[in-house]
Amino acid sequence: MASSSTVPLGFHYETKYVVLSYLGLLSQEKLQEQHLSSPQGVQLDIASQSLDQEILLKVKTEIEEELKSLDKEISEAFTSTGFDRHTSPVFSPANPESSMEDCLAHLGEKVSQELKEPLHKALQMLLSQPVTYQAFRECTLETTVHASGWNKILVPLVLLRQMLLELTRRGQEPLSALLQFGVTYLEDYSAEYIIQQGGWGTVFSLESEEEEYPGITAEDSNDIYILPSDNSGQVSPPESPTVTTSWQSESLPVSLSASQSWHTESLPVSLGPESWQQIAMDPEEVKSLDSNGAGEKSENNSSNSDIVHVEKEEVPEGMEEAAVASVVLPARELQEALPEAPAPLLPHITATSLLGTREPDTEVITVEKSSPATSLFVELDEEEVKAATTEPTEVEEVVPALEPTETLLSEKEINAREESLVEELSPASEKKPVPPSEGKSRLSPAGEMKPMPLSEGKSILLFGGAAAVAILAVAIGVALALRKK
């Protein structure tokens, strides 16, 4: 703060009043339990505390006399200066409940706590030598290096009050000299800053700001930064990889928001978050899914991302490449493996379902289950296909979904149906003889053609029935296994 040789007369009066008001706080404060020791190191005892009461009373009386002298000086100079104490915010605050003494006391206490060590060192240096303005100025300037802003203004006031108490205890009367030290120092080194801030009346605003924002000057390393709500709807990519979890970041298109990543992960960009609802499904598959809906709700929601949507035209080709359970067995092997397997209702097996692959050259029948990941390949002889086509009233397009509670026919009913099929098979085989090359050709599991002798009569029907029984038994087992999963 630069030195100022001349200041306005009103500022001089206000500065003098500020110094007297702050020094007068000694008589209003309670004695502390511990006082600064004297230069000889003698501690004050209980008897000396009563002496301090007398000292404080004496200081109060002297300050009151100085204030009366200041009022008289202002009144006498009014005609020449035009300064009216009633218009000054220092002498007459706008708020009657607040006073300059109270504001200075609060600010001075804060400075005393923040600069405790530098102030104590400066006080000891001043008390160890004769009291002069030059010594006071040097010690004050060294102490203000540790302060900034209005705290620099409070440093000389705090030193003056402590010096007044100690020198009065020694029996001296330093009030007049210390008052002059304070006024001169403030006018020389602080006047420019105070005037730029708006004068001494700014002290009241400093007090009100600290009451409204108690932590405004404190530095807090745990500040909480609140993001504005304007851009709350926009989700920007996080800067740190630790913030984003792998299930949100893997295979996520840029156009998709983070809130939809759990059910759009690994989906094509063309498919929206609700595209799975628009894919056409088989009626029997819908029925099967509805029956298992309660059990599937308990599964992890993240499994929705594993659903693979396949067009209906791609199902036959995909089943051949990625079928989980596919069984292609000759009729003889099925008969040997399951000789006593119960047969389900044969009328439900129709000609269209037996020719599901729509490829007459290979004679492979695909039985579609409720799960698109499972397929069952069954091979039947030409005789069995011809026998099945003789019942046009039983033609259906889709094999009904197999239920675990399906009722099986008894042995008598099976024998009766076999006999009826034999009777129907005889005229059909006589009208349309099957070439030996077609009857003997079969598809092995590896896809190679192998010759097979054509069975005649009832043995063909028995072998075909056993094959159908085995096929349906395997299909039921696969369906139950998939539902348990």
Curated annotation (Swiss-Prot):
Gene3D superfamilies: Blc2-like. A motif (BH3) lies at residues 100-116. The modification Phosphoserine is found at S38, S259, S261, S303, S326, S371, S375, S410, S420, S426, S429, S444. The gene is BCL2L13. A motif (BH4) lies at residues 14-30. Keywords: Apoptosis, Membrane, Mitochondrion, Nucleus, Phosphoprotein, Repeat, Transmembrane, Transmembrane helix. One of its GO terms (cellular component) is membrane. A repeats lie at residues 246-256, 261-271. Belongs to the Bcl-2 family. Residues 229-248 have a biased composition (Polar residues). B repeats lie at residues 425-441, 443-459. A motif (BH2) lies at residues 193-206. Ubiquitous, with the highest levels of expression in heart, placenta and pancreas. Signal peptide: none annotated. PANTHER family: BCL-2-LIKE PROTEIN 13. A motif (BH1) lies at residues 147-157. The chain crosses the membrane at residues 460-480. It comes from Homo sapiens. Pfam families: Bcl-2. GO terms for molecular function: cysteine-type endopeptidase activator activity involved in apoptotic process. This is Bcl-2-like protein 13. Residues 218-248, 418-451 are annotated as: Disordered. GO terms for biological process: apoptotic process; canonical glycolysis; fat cell differentiation; mitochondrion organization; mitophagy; oxidative phosphorylation; regulation of apoptotic process.
